[in-house]
């Protein structure tokens, strides 16, 4: 059984036992989180919410808080002017513990 959850303005397809890196959530390592479920499916059938499904829960456990690899943004003009900026996006790694339909 799988589910499509929404968190941090993005959607993720998850199943029980998956580890997912999502946008940073407030919480400590070992804490529990619940997600909005948009779709649940398995064995050739799917239920779609309008916009979310009532009675369906996806629970996860926070495994780690970290930062992604650095992304470098570099701009250069013809006159010799340059600008270099870096950014590391924070993330939360979550272990999906249960998907209940």
UniProtKB/Swiss-Prot annotation:
Any one Gene Ontology cellular component term annotated for this protein: ribonucleoprotein complex
Keywords from the named record: Ribonucleoprotein, Ribosomal protein, RNA-binding, rRNA-binding
Source organism: Anaeromyxobacter dehalogenans (strain 2CP-C)
Highest taxon, organism lineage: Bacteria
Presence of keyword tRNA-binding: no
Quaternary structure and interacting proteins, as annotated: Part of the 50S ribosomal subunit. Contacts protein L20.
Protein name as it appears in the record: Large ribosomal subunit protein bL21
InterPro entries in UniProt: bL21-like, bL21-like_sf, Ribosomal_bL21
Keyword Nucleus: no
Gene Ontology MF term list: rRNA binding; structural constituent of ribosome
Biological role stated in the UniProt entry: This protein binds to 23S rRNA in the presence of protein L20.
UniProt family annotation: Belongs to the bacterial ribosomal protein bL21 family.
Biological process terms in GO annotation: translation
Record-linked NCBIfam families: L21
A Pfam cross-reference name: Ribosomal_L21p
